[in-house]
Structures are given as structure tokens and as C-alpha cells.
């Protein structure tokens, strides 16, 4: 069986990506199941026993900026080795809530970690591995802030300022501009129905 495809959902907290994950997974299953493939839905940080333990630390414990980035990539290496690569090799498709673009956006854009340090970690952990498709849910920081305030108690990242999320969003958009061949940008201020229509079109194009 041919290798599967790797799809990631990205966006600042409050962009609405999680709202569409389960729906997208179900539609994707309908597309690939006739060929005997499955869709593995996962997340970062997380996706493995070790990754989920690191996720709890990353979301709730204060730490040095470089420590934060190193833990993100440590969780990612385990995620690739234990979940993503094996699934793709057996022909399944993988749908992940965040991947490396989030680290460049949050630790790089938001926190200001130099890009060359993140690029060095990316080369070490991933080689040249990248998603086949990255769906970026884009929304202004003030809109995202309103959505977050109506949700559950915020974690360490969700509690950041609008200025932090403006920098994070800008880095996401810079990444998308650099790699238009794999990015699809979703205007997440639109209705759920309009967004899902665009997602349907993306699935049909895969």
C-alpha cells in the first residue's frame, strides 16, 4: 500500500481549529476507508504516553524559554517515532492538532526565540519531514481572545496577551507565505458552514 498522508491543523488559541477537527476526521475517513486506510487523529504536544506527560508540564509549569522549545521537540521526536511515521508507513493518514509550525509561531514568534535555533532542532528531529497539508485557521487576536474567554479555564499559553498572539499569528502567516504549496489558509471569522465547505473542497483535492 502507498504511504499515507500527513495533515496538520494550526492556528492561535481561539482560532477555532479544534471545532472542526472531529468533523474533518470523519469526512477524511469516508474518503480513505474504501481503499482500506484509516485516519489517525493525534495532537501536539502529546500523542504518546511520554508526549502527554510533557504536555501537562508544558501547559501548566513555568520554565525557561529554551527548555520549553527543547521539550516541544522532544515530545515531537517521540510522536514521530511512535505514532506518525508508523501510521504513514502502513498507508494510514494522520491528522494532527498542531505540529512544528506551532513551535515556530509560539516559541519563535510569540516568545522571541531565534529562528535559527528552532531550525536546527527541526533539522535534527525531522530531517526534511514536513506535512503534506497544513490547514491554518486564521483569526485576529481580539476575536480569538473573546472566544478563549468564553471557554474553559485557560492554560499557560491561552493566558498570554493579545500582543503575544499578534506575534504568533504573524509568524504563522510568514510560514504560510514561505510554503504556499502545503498551506491552506482558512478565514476563521466566517460561519461554521462556510468553513466546512472550504474544508470539503480541500479533502476533495487530496
UniProtKB/Swiss-Prot annotation:
The keyword Signal does not apply. ATP binds at residues 11-18. Keywords: ATP-binding, Kinase, Nucleotide biosynthesis, Nucleotide-binding, Transferase. Disulfide bonds: none annotated. One of its GO terms (molecular function) is dTMP kinase activity. Its EC number is 2.7.4.9. SUPFAM superfamilies: P-loop containing nucleoside triphosphate hydrolases (SSF52540). One of its GO terms (cellular component) is cytosol. It comes from the Bacteria. It is an enzyme of class 2 (transferase). InterPro entries: P-loop_NTPase, Thymidylate_kin-like_dom, Thymidylate_kinase. It holds the Pfam family Thymidylate_kin. One of its GO terms (biological process) is dTTP biosynthetic process. It catalyses: dTMP + ATP = dTDP + ADP. PANTHER family: THYMIDYLATE KINASE (PTHR10344), UMP-CMP KINASE 2, MITOCHONDRIAL (PTHR10344:SF4). Phosphorylation of dTMP to form dTDP in both de novo and salvage pathways of dTTP synthesis. Belongs to the thymidylate kinase family. This is Thymidylate kinase. It comes from Paraburkholderia phymatum (strain DSM 17167 / CIP 108236 / LMG 21445 / STM815).
Amino acid at each position: 500500500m502507498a504511504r499515507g498522508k500527513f495533515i496538520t491543523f494550526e492556528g492561535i488559541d481561539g482560532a477555532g481549529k479544534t471545532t472542526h477537527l472531529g468533523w474533518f476526521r470523519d469526512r477524511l475517513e469516508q474518503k480513505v476507508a474504501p481503499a482500506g486506510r484509516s485516519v489517525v487523529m493525534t495532537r501536539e504536544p502529546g500523542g504518546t504516553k511520554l508526549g502527554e506527560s510533557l504536555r501537562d508540564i508544558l501547559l501548566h509549569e513555568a520554565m525557561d524559554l529554551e527548555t520549553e522549545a527543547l521539550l516541544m521537540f522532544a515530545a515531537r521526536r517521540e510522536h514521530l517515532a511512535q505514532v506518525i511515521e508508523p501510521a504513514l508507513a502502513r498507508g494510514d493518514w494522520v491528522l494532527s492538532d498542531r505540529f512544528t509550525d506551532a513551535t515556530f509561531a509560539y516559541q519563535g514568534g510569540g516568545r522571541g526565540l531565534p529562528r535559527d535555533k528552532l531550525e536546527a532542532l527541526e533539522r535534527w528531529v525531522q530531517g526534511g519531514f514536513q506535512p503534506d497539508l497544513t490547514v491554518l485557521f486564521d483569526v485576529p487576536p481580539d476575536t480569538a481572545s473573546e472566544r478563549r474567554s468564553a471557554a474553559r479555564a485557560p492554560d499557560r499559553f491561552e493566558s498570554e496577551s493579545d500582543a503575544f498572539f499578534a506575534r504568533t499569528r504573524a509568524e504563522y502567516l510568514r510560514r504560510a507565505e514561505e510554503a504556499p504549496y502545503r498551506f491552506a489558509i482558512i478565514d476563521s471569522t466566517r460561519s461554521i458552514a462556510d468553513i466546512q465547505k472550504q474544508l470539503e473542497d480541500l479533502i476533495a483535492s487530496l
